[in-house]
Every structure is written in structure tokens, then in C-alpha cells.
């Protein structure tokens, strides 16, 4: 198998962990006769230092042309890094949001598995830790608060911040379907977490989820 992998080393510990991940991929190539080529893509603080913005159109094009993208970490110390003297839309994390949107990466999969060797370090109740767990947590990435309108303004002499939470039925339906598809390969159980007793967006989420 031949693959071109976009490599985003990113910031902070990113270059270090990406270098180790590439060693693993290279070993996979050796063992299974695959061929991986790598294209470096700048994102976040590294892109700000090089180009003055957290993500360039060229970087988005490079990521889209890749078969997969390997990413380290994005951002730095908000107290000391000059990146955080910039307005929010030009900070490292803004580039990450742009990349998610540009690649349509709407579903974030986060497995949580408790291995026997780590049960003693688990902060959950012993009866839960003893049983162990194997969860797949899915988070929606391209809608909602992160991509809604936001503002901070003074109203009647008081600073007031606003963040708009918006989802449409198509955004909800596609991530619900992805959740169901994954569940069919596991234990065939899906739990949707919402706040439908208060939020309109959660009521729509529950309605579309049930209908899907």
C-alpha cells in the first residue's frame, strides 16, 4: 500500500511525539511492505512564525491532497507565548478549527479503555474499575459553539460576552449515523448526551438522533 501522509508537527511537544509516531509508521512499512511518503504541513504557532497566520491556503491544499494527516499538538503557553498577544482569530487554535472545517472533520473519536495494569490508578469507584470499561466517545467538531458567532461588548456599562450555539439537522444526522455505524461494530449501544430540558439545539439533537 502506498500512502502520502501530511505531517503536522505543530508546537510544543508536537515535533517530538510526531517523530516517534513516524518511527512506528516506518516500522509498519518494513514489516508489511507498505510505502509511506511524508509532506510537512505547517499549522498553528509554527505557521504564525513562518507566515504570520495560523493556517495558509497552501497548507489546507496540502492536507486535502494527503491520504491521511498525522498531527502533533497545537498552541503554547497562553501566559508567555507571543502568539496569544494576537487577536483570537489569528492564534494557533484558530488554524486548527479552520483545518477541521476545510477537511470536513466533523467526528472526533476518543477511545477510553481501562487496562488491567492501570486499574489501581483509576479514579472511579472500585466496583466500576474492577469491571473495566471500553468506551468510544464521539464529539462533534465543525458546528456548535466553536463555529458560532461570538462577541464581547459593553452593555449598560457591563462587559458582556456572547457565543452562539447553532446546529442544523444535517450536521446532527451525519454524526448520529457515524455513531450508529461504529456501534454496530462494537456492542450495538449508543448514548447521546444533551441538555434537551433547556436548550433548543439539544431538543433538535435528540429529535434527529431518535429519527436516525
Q: Can you describe what each PLM-predicted range is?
A:
Residues 1-12, 39-41:
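Generic N-terminal amphipathic, Lys/Arg-enriched alpha-helix
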Residues 49-161:
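N-terminal glycine-rich phosphate/adenylate-binding segment common to multiple enzyme folds
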Residues 46, 77-78, 198-200:
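Short, active-site-adjacent cap segments at secondary-structure transitions
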Residues 10-12, 43, 74, 114, ...:
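Short, ordered loop/turn segments at secondary-structure junctions
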Residues 37-41, 110, 191:
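General small-molecule cofactor/ligand-binding pocket signal
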Amino acid at each position: 500500500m502506498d500512502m502520502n501522509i501530511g505531517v503536522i508537527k505543530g508546537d510544543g511537544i508536537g515535533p517530538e511525539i510526531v517523530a516517534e509516531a513516524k518511527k512506528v509508521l516506518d516500522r509498519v512499512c518494513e514489516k508489511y511492505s507498505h510505502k509511506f511518503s511524508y509532506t510537512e504541513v505547517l499549522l498553528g504557532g509554527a505557521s504564525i512564525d513562518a507566515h504570520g497566520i495560523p493556517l495558509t491556503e497552501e497548507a489546507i491544499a496540502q492536507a486535502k491532497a494527503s491520504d491521511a494527516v498525522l498531527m502533533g499538538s497545537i498552541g503554547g503557553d497562553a501566559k508567555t507565548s507571543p502568539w496569544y498577544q494576537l487577536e483570537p482569530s489569528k492564534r494557533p487554535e484558530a488554524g486548527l478549527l479552520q483545518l477541521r472545517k476545510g477537511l470536513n472533520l466533523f467526528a472526533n473519536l476518543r477511545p477510553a479503555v481501562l487496562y488491567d495494569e492501570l486499574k489501581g490508578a483509576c479514579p472511579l469507584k472500585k466496583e466500576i474499575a474492577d469491571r473495566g470499561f471500553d468506551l468510544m466517545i464521539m464529539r462533534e467538531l465543525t458546528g456548535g459553539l466553536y463555529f458560532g458567532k461570538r462577541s464581547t461588548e459593553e452593555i449598560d456599562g457591563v462587559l458582556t460576552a456572547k457565543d452562539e450555539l447553532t446546529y442544523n439537522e444535517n450536521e446532527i444526522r451525519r454524526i448520529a449515523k457515524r455513531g450508529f455505524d461504529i456501534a454496530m461494530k462494537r456492542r450495538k449501544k449508543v448514548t447521546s448526551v444533551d441538555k434537551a430540558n433547556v436548550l433548543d439545539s439539544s431538543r433538535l439533537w435528540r429529535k434527529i438522533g431518535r429519527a436516525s
